[in-house]
Amino acid sequence: MFGFFKKREEVFHRLIQEQASITYDGVKLLVKYFETQDREIAEELALKEKQADEVRRILIDELNGTFVTPFDREDIFALSRSIDDVIDYADSTVSEMVVLKVNPTPYMQRIATLLKDAAYEIFQAVQRLQKNPAVAIDHAQRAKALENRVEESTARRLPICSADRKIFTMLSRC
């Protein structure tokens, strides 16, 4: 009887790990796209996003059909949603860059690399969650530190963007 609960627990861990793996692969494609601007890479990223969405749908279906979960169902749902947000944003960024014909700047490439590193830490965290929760926490903290670096870098860049916007506005009036 207890073997049934163990198998159900493993389903959730496996699905979260799969979602994090696909997301990490997707963010690596974001970095690669920024290096090459290759449309095939953009298409690969779009496929990864769809794969990640499918894994998330299966996870939600499993959550809805299960009474006992390895940890709080809202936490599982929130973790999955957060991982999904990462690949969604990567895909939408590349899609918009393709449509708007925007070339990545060195700043954008640095941010993408930091995001890739954070996605790797998230991937490592969910890999370790079941058997080594303390190690998983270390990886999660590293991911958070990388997120903070992205936010700090963005905050430093905002005044430059604002100045660029003012110049663009002035030029567009001419």
Stretch-by-stretch model annotation:
Residues 1-174:
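Cytosolic, long alpha-helical scaffolding segments
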